[in-house]
Design a protein with these regions (language model features):
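Catalytic cores of DNA base-excision repair glycosylases
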Residues: 2-218
Length: 219
């Protein structure tokens, strides 16, 4: 199978499995999505979705958020981990949104990535899921799957993102990155992975990844 055929197989298979694909983080607008994505660093989406209703009940916009102290924010988000850094980021970026952006989340990478605690991946998620602007946020699931499928040799998420953008049509990026995340969680996990359930890796997977799996099964 050529690389182009592999890419088409991935697109078609994921479209069959996930014709409708949910956004993992609960939110109602760009601001609440931005905060949820910030909280998701080194934390599960399930945990974030348990904590954000508690935070957003007190403040679901930057104007209300800056009425809270950093300490109050930190106590609410503590179960998400890294709460000192995240609470500082939430408080400071809320101030900047008010001071520089009329309280609105900017719909461009430059302004987003200038916000405290907002890196390229967070900005990409907001651009894609809040504003429907083509982006391809790469998380650990996408990084792992692109390697297993032989579509990227990237040792960093930055390189994997470049490969994904080069291989997949731009008009499919926003949906496809979500489809790959869900597929990684349900069929191609880092641990407890069962090749028989993983039609994509079984069909187009990197030989080294498949051989490693088979070797581990014999132990």
């Amino acid at each position: 199978m050529t690389k182009a055929e592999k890419v088409n197989f991935v697109i078609d298979t994921l479209e069959n499995i996930y014709p409708e694909v949910p956004i993992p983080l609960d939110h109602k607008d760009p601001y609440t999505l931005l905060i949820a994505v910030l909280l998701s660093a080194q934390c599960t989406d399930v945990r974030v979705n348990q904590i954000t209703p508690l935070l957003f009940a007190k403040a679901d916009n930057p104007y209300d958020m800056i009425k809270l102290t950093q300490e109050e924010i930190k106590e609410i988000i503590r179960p998400c981990g890294l709460s000192p850094m995240k609470s500082k980021g939430i408080y400071e970026l809320s101030h900047i949104l008010i001071d520089k952006h009329q309280g609105e989340v900017p719909a461009n990478f430059v302004d987003l990535e200038e916000l405290p605690a907002v890196g390229h991946k967070t900005a990409s998620v907001v651009m894609s899921q809040a504003f429907n602007i083509p982006a391809f946020p790469v998380d650990t699931h996408i990084h792992r799957l692109m390697y297993r499928w032989g579509l990227s040799n990237g040792t960093t998420v930055q390189q994997t993102e470049k490969d994904a953008k080069r291989l997949f049509p731009e008009e499919k990026w926003n949906k496809l990155h979500l489809q790959i995340i869900w597929y990684g969680r349900e069929y191609c996990q880092a641990r407890g992975w069962k090749l028989d359930n993983d039609i994509i890796t079984k069909t187009i997977g990197r030989k080294a990844a498949i051989n490693e799996y088979l070797k581990n099964q014999k132990k």
